[in-house]
Structure formats: structure tokens, C-alpha cells
Regions:
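Carboxylate- and glycine-rich phosphate/diphosphate-binding segment that chelates Mg2+/Mn2+
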Residues: 148-270
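C-terminal charged capping/lid subdomain of soluble metabolic enzymes
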Residues: 323-390
């Protein structure tokens, strides 16, 4: 046995940990670029809460609130330009995966020159970035736990990760208390993404003992708590009786949030595989929500790959009360149904005419994901799998 495990991230997990943001930020300077989406952090009051703590500690700040879902390379460059012009010492991200990923690009390009796409495609490298502090407000992408920042080039539609240790957050403030403002459909999407991260890391070619232990634990948490939590949040949004009592709700939020962070951590080392490799072209082309795309793709992907490692896929299936790896795809479809997610690409606006572009783009942005998949897969196989999703 031989492996390496290195993940220099400071996870600060707990209820109301966000109130300590100034203490965590103080070692990194006296002025922060705060990166958010356009409205949600302000509407929830979290932005004002963070700013109040920074003000009390005499830490200056400037706001960049132009990040949308599926963040663009151009947006990251705009944020980096603002960080430079305002002489910011650090970046603080408040939001979901899109905000955290874009903040990583901002922190990186604030101290590096040239075309960000050169770094994304490894034509250039750097291990420098502004210090980054993240406050995730969704429990799905796990961006708080790794050195990946997924960005889309608006000119080409290429959706691919900027990857380096410099953009691993210096501090990740993982606070279950700030997750409660998520609408049900967002929780469903990000929660399924978290599940996919752990499944793919657990079954990847580069899986190893540490990632196996973490991912296995995270899947057990999600198998137990994700659907009940979603049903509770949905019931509350619809004015219906609560599904969970207060004690159960606290445990569910903690468990799903922790599993999400673990998912981000394990993919930093063990990577993702076929489903993510096929989804990034889809959300690069149509700007669909990542977790929604995975809900269509992951069941098909595991049905293709399970025979290459029946022991691990079988262990996963049994976590969902199914018999062996051959049943994992069906287990995931039941979860997709319970989360009210989409089941085919047609519903997401795709036609079969899109398949050639999707297949070609897999080999532009996701060759590493394909190589990390335990089953051998060809271009014709990928084309056939896309066809199954209509």
C-alpha cells in the first residue's frame, strides 16, 4: 500500500461560528474583499452580520456582489481587478459553491498575471493567491474543503476547475445555522451534489484509505438525513406540519452540512469521476444547476461503472437498503424522486442534437475525470450514455 494525503484547510465547524469571523480574518490583514451573490446574503442578513463583526475589529472591507450561478472566468477577473485596486489583503466569500469557486478565482488572479484559462488548463502554474476565508451558505459543493474553483469560459462554454493548494481556504467557517435560508429546491440540488462527491471519491481510481473512511461516513449521513431534511424544509415552505422535531432537525442540519464538507475534502484527494465529467459539459452549455444535472447523470453513470468494483458499489447500495452494486442506480433514482429533481435531459432543455458537442467537450474539460473512473470508457460509450438520459 502506498498513498499521499495532504489537505491544508482549517475547518471551523459549529453553530454560530460565523460570529468569530473577525478573529479568523485578523491574521491575514486589515482589508477584505467580500464576495457574495447579488441578493441572498443581504436578504438573509448574513452579509450585515459579517460586516458588523469586521467593523468592530477595525477590518476594512469592500463588496463584490456580481457572482451568478455557474460563475464565469470573466467575473473572477472583474473581482480580482477590484481587489487589486482596493489593495485588499484577503478575500472573504459568503455564499454557496458558485460564490466560493469564484472567490477562489478572484483570490488567485489578484496576485497572478495573464489569462486565467492558461492556469485552468495547466499551461501556466502558480502557488500564490490572496488568503481566502469562506462561509458556505449551502451544503453541497464542499468548496470549503478543497483547492478547486470551477469556472466557465463564456466564449467557449468550457467549464473546468482551477486547481492549486493556494486556493484552499485558510479558514472555512462551516456553520449549520446559516444553512436554513435555503429554499427546498436548492437544498435538493446541493444535497445531491454532496452525495455524488462522496460516491465518486469512494469509487475512484485514486481513492485511498483516508478518503474511503471519510466518504463512507459521509454517505451514511446523507443516506439517513438528506431526504428527511428536504421533506421538512419543503413542508415548512408550503405551510405544512413539520416533518422533524427540533432535536431531529438540528441533527439533520449538522449531518448534511458535515457530509457536504467531507465531500469537498475527499474529492480534493480522490477526485471525481464519470458523472461529473459528463455534467460539466452539460451545465457549461445550458447553464443548468450542477446538482440538477447530476441527478440525471449519476444513476446512469453508476449503472455503467459498478461492475468494475462490485465490492465498493455494493457497499454503497447497502447504505440505501439495496442488495448490491447493480441496484445503486435505482437507489439513486429513488432519492432523485424523493428530492423532486429532474430525471432526464429533455426537461433541462437539451435535445439529442446537443450530444456531439457534449461528447466532444468531455474530452476538452474532463479527461482527468474519465481517467479516474474505474471502468474503461470510450467516446462511443459516453455518447450512448448521454442518449440514455433522454
Amino acid at each position: 500500500m502506498e498513498f499521499s494525503y495532504f489537505l491544508p484547510v482549517n475547518i471551523q465547524f459549529g453553530w454560530n461560528k460565523v460570529d468569530n469571523v473577525a478573529d479568523f480574518a485578523a491574521p491575514y490583514g486589515k482589508k477584505a474583499l467580500i464576495v457574495t451573490g447579488r441578493t441572498s446574503a443581504k436578504k438573509s442578513g448574513l452579509y450585515d452580520r459579517v460586516v458588523a463583526k469586521l467593523d468592530a475589529a477595525h477590518i476594512g472591507h469592500v463588496l463584490f456582489d456580481q457572482v451568478d450561478a455557474n460563475p464565469l472566468t470573466t467575473t473572477a477577473l472583474d473581482g480580482a481587478a477590484l481587489a487589486k485596486s482596493e489593495n485588499c489583503n484577503m478575500v472573504i466569500a459568503i455564499g454557496g459553491g458558485s460564490i466560493m469557486d469564484c472567490a477562489k478565482g478572484i483570490a488567485f488572479m489578484a496576485v497572478n498575471e495573464g489569462d486565467i484559462n492558461d492556469y485552468i488548463f495547466n499551461r501556466k502554474t502558480s502557488d500564490n493567491a490572496l488568503p481566502l476565508i469562506v462561509i458556505p451558505t449551502t451544503c453541497g459543493t464542499g468548496s470549503e474543503g478543497n483547492g478547486f474553483g470551477v469556472l466557465t469560459n463564456p466564449e467557449t462554454g468550457d467549464k473546468k476547475s482551477l486547481r492549486c493548494n493556494a486556493i484552499v481556504p485558510k479558514v472555512s467557517i462551516v456553520d449549520p445555522a446559516v444553512m436554513g435560508t435555503m429554499p427546498p429546491h436548492v437544498l435538493a440540488s446541493v444535497g445531491f451534489d454532496a452525495l455524488c462527491h462522496n460516491i465518486e471519491a469512494y469509487t475512484s481510481k485514486t481513492a485511498q484509505p483516508f478518503t474511503d473512511a471519510l466518504a463512507h461516513y459521509a454517505v451514511t449521513l446523507l443516506a439517513q438525513y438528506l431526504v428527511p431534511l428536504y421533506k421538512h424544509v419543503k413542508a415548512m415552505a408550503e405551510g405544512k406540519p413539520a416533518v422533524l422535531n427540533e432535536t431531529q432537525l438540528t441533527k439533520a442540519w449538522e449531518s448534511v452540512t458535515l457530509a457536504s464538507t467531507i465531500g469537498g475534502m475527499v474529492i480534493n484527494t480522490a477526485g471525481v469521476t464519470l458523472a461529473h465529467g459528463m455534467e460539466h459539459p452539460a451545465s457549461g452549455l445550458k447553464d443548468i444547476t450542477h446538482g440538477v444535472g447530476l441527478a440525471v447523470i449519476e444513476p446512469v453513470a453508476v449503472e455503467y461503472t459498478w461492475r468494475a468494483n462490485p465490492d465498493k458499489f455494493g457497499a454503497l447500495a447497502r447504505m440505501f437498503n439495496h442488495g448490491d452494486g447493480s441496484e445503486l442506480g435505482e437507489a439513486l433514482r429513488l432519492i432523485v424522486h424523493d428530492l423532486d429533481l429532474t430525471t432526464n435531459l429533455t426537461e433541462l432543455g437539451f435535445t439529442k442534437k446537443d450530444i456531439p458537442w457534449l461528447v466532444d467537450n468531455v474530452y476538452v474539460v474532463a479527461t482527468g475525470n474519465i481517467a479516474n473512473t474505474v471502468a474503461e470508457i470510450s467516446r462511443k460509450d459516453i455518447e450512448a450514455l448521454y442518449k440514455k438520459m433522454f
